[in-house]
Curated annotation (Swiss-Prot):
GO terms for molecular function: growth factor activity; neurotrophin TRKB receptor binding. Residues 1-18 form the signal peptide. Mature BDNF is produced by proteolytic removal of the propeptide, catalyzed by a FURIN family member. In addition, the precursor form is proteolytically cleaved within the propeptide, but this is not an obligatory intermediate for the production of mature BDNF. Can be converted into mature BDNF by plasmin (PLG). GO terms for cellular component: axon; cytoplasm; cytoplasmic vesicle; dendrite; endoplasmic reticulum lumen; extracellular region; extracellular space; glutamatergic synapse. It comes from Mus musculus (Mouse). Pfam families: NGF (PF00243). Keywords: Cleavage on pair of basic residues, Disulfide bond, Glycoprotein, Growth factor, Secreted, Signal. This is Neurotrophic factor BDNF precursor form. One of its GO terms (biological process) is positive regulation of collateral sprouting. Monomers and homodimers. Binds to NTRK2/TRKB. Can form heterodimers with other neurotrophin family members, such as NTF3 and NTF4 (in vitro), but the physiological relevance of this is not clear. BDNF precursor form: interacts with the heterodimer formed by NGFR and SORCS2. Mature BDNF has much lower affinity for the heterodimer formed by NGFR and SORCS2.
């Protein structure tokens, strides 16, 4: 399974032909170099010239990805906005990717989370694993959601952290040309079975509704004064159930 997972990750990086860009501080919005979140390029761009060679071992590859994830998590802590002022939104830098083509897989951190869940399940006994399988227990999501990669051409505008409307730029200039901005969005499924209310809620006592919520990610944008820079914008990242109690019964 480890080899299969690493193969998936190699394919994930291989389909992204993005050039590495210089990192800058979050406050340096005038610089077009992408801060914090890295582009997904070849293995050579991630870990030097030797990382892309065919002689790369499984151990060194795993160390490479572990190092990348640690840097992403460290950067996430550095640029996280004041949580007291933004309690209604989180920061998901892993949902943004710069690429020359549509990504074929979910964000890398999502794949790592699935892999972690597999390892946890592998440590269970057969009986415990069988009974912990959501499909066997008949578990269903409270709200049906869909996730997909979208481009700035789909979004066009977004709301930044100050509440202003900014234009999301479709392409980002790099040393060897331009790359498109892709955003991994999750929202409530309008064609799902929960469009009339949350699943499993007692309708005699509660009013329920599945609602799409948003989080902050960083993207290259242009404000109303034509100033281009990296800003935090809101994108759809989850589908949650909201409840209100029925009164007058």
């Amino acid at each position: 399974m480890t080899i299969l997972f690493l193969t998936m990750v190699i394919s994930y990086f291989g389909c992204m032909k993005a050039a590495p860009m210089k990192e800058v501080n979050v406050h340096g919005q005038g610089n077009l170099a992408y801060p914090g979140v890295r582009t997904h390029g070849t293995l050579e761009s991630v870990n030097g010239p030797r990382a892309g060679s065919r002689g790369l071992t499984t151990t060194s590859l795993a160390d490479t990805f572990e190092h990348v994830i640690e840097e992403l998590l460290d950067e996430d802590q550095k640029v996280r906005p004041n949580e007291e002022n933004h309690k209604d939104a989180d920061l998901y830098t892993s949902r943004v990717m710069l690429s020359s083509q549509v990504p074929l897989e979910p964000p890398l951190l999502f794949l790592l989370e699935e892999y972690k869940n597999y390892l946890d399940a592998a440590n269970m006994s057969m009986r415990v694993r069988r009974h912990s399988d959501p499909a066997r227990r008949g578990e269903l999501s409270v709200c049906d959601s869909i996730s997909e990669w979208v481009t700035a051409a789909d979004k066009k505008t977004a709301v930044d952290m100050s509440g202003g409307t900014v234009t999301v730029l479709e392409k980002v200039p790099v040393s060897k040309g331009q790359l498109k901005q892709y955003f991994y969005e999750t929202k409530c499924n309008p064609m799902g079975y929960t469009k009339e209310g949350c699943r499993g809620i007692d309708k005699r006592h509660w009013n329920s509704q599945c609602r799409t919520t948003q989080s902050y990610v960083r993207a290259l944008t242009m404000d109303s004064k034509k100033r281009i820079g990296w800003r935090f914008i809101r994108i759809d990242t989850s589908c949650v159930c909201t409840l209100t109690i029925k009164r007058g019964r």
